Amino acid sequence: MSVLIIDGGIPLKGKVTAQGCKNSALAILAAAALCEDRVYLTNVPDIGDVKTMMSILRSLGYKVTWGSGLTIKPGVIKNYDLTHTGAGSIRGSLLFLGALLGRLGKVVLPMPGGCNIGTRPIDLHLKGLSLMGASLDIQGGNIVGEAPSGLKGAYVYLDFPSVGATENIMIAGALASGETTIENAAQDQQVVELGKFLMACGVKIHGLGTKVIRIKGKKEIGGVTFRISGDSIEAGTYAIAAAATRGSITVDGVDVTFLRPLLFKLQEAGIEVVVTNGHEVTVLPSPRPKGITIKTMPFPGFPTDLQPLMMSLLATAEGRSVITETVYDGRMGHVSELWKMGANIEVEGNTAIITGVEKLTGAPVVANNLRAGAALVVAGLSAEGRSVVYGMEHVMRGYSNIHQKLRALDAKVELVSDEEAVNIA
């Protein structure tokens, strides 16, 4: 177990470059299983979930190497059963459903893991792939799928604009015969970037970034060289950390389009934000934020992944804030940890009512998932005194070198093992 020791209350300052987008990388790595030729990816984030996806590709028979970029060379695909590959540990592995059904016509995949944030159903994935001709069943905790006659293009209406379901259907549609239409598709960064990757591989896609996406399938998909764009969630994390510590940070290398919902809410709270060239955001030193109301929604709404972090910021805002979580039904696990730091938060169902306090106080806290852990790091950075964040391995699933980046921004942090933490804390 990894532990982050934080001596808080220091305004962050400096510049940080956003890592490659975690969620885009996971989708593209799954889609790379469609390719008959070499795929070379740059700006791939050095994080745990990416390494798990690399391991899955190797188990399928691909040669995967990481140098200045990530190279994926196809071999003879020798496996379609992913039950012993670590695939069950991350949600992103679910995207191998569409990839292997398209490429091999069969797949066995453990039910996906990932963050513990309530119910995350896969019914929309299964519904979409079934409409494309796949036979899918849940057996012994595994998803067993077959498409002996191959996948066929279909019209798929999503009851909810699920990012994962949109991605899975796009990946499957790339090798399906005919055209696949996804209505009420997700419009998030990783969906757009997956589409750009598939298009770079020669797949014809229309409507990318809109609610209706059309994919014209191909018989074979070649290789490509592709650069993954900056991670808007990581960029947002550092922007929120700057606001929470009353500091000033510039984040570059990110498409501000996907940050606008966050930037609007920061400005509403009284935080001064400057956008430069559409790829750089500066958060300027600002006074104590004002209470605001946030409701998470699929993009272009406010991103659920930044909800826990905004709660850490608003815990010291002036007045009352209300945050309603509509995407996941269990994304309030960080509240009990913020209580330990002195936050005044009441939870009613999926709504948190936050009465701002003057300051948080450092305390030992436990991260139980990726974004909750990042929220506790932000809280620790802004708090007075020392905080000890246990469970940092969850955070490092999505943030590369977070402790080193924070140090470069003047934060006083140290990443240690839990055994070392006993002596330091």
Curated annotation (Swiss-Prot):
This is UDP-N-acetylglucosamine 1-carboxyvinyltransferase. It is an enzyme of class 2 (transferase). It is found in: Cytoplasm. It comes from Coprothermobacter proteolyticus (strain ATCC 35245 / DSM 5265 / OCM 4 / BT). Its main location: cytoplasm. GO terms for cellular component: cytoplasm. One of its GO terms (biological process) is peptidoglycan biosynthetic process. UDP-N-acetyl-alpha-D-glucosamine binds at R91, R120, P121, I122, D123, L124, D305, V327. It catalyses: phosphoenolpyruvate + UDP-N-acetyl-alpha-D-glucosamine = UDP-N-acetyl-3-O-(1-carboxyvinyl)-alpha-D-glucosamine + phosphate. InterPro entries: Enolpyruvate_Tfrase_dom, Enolpyruvate_Tfrase_sf, MurA_subfamily, RNA3'P_cycl/enolpyr_Trfase_a/b, UDP_GlcNAc_COvinyl_MurA.
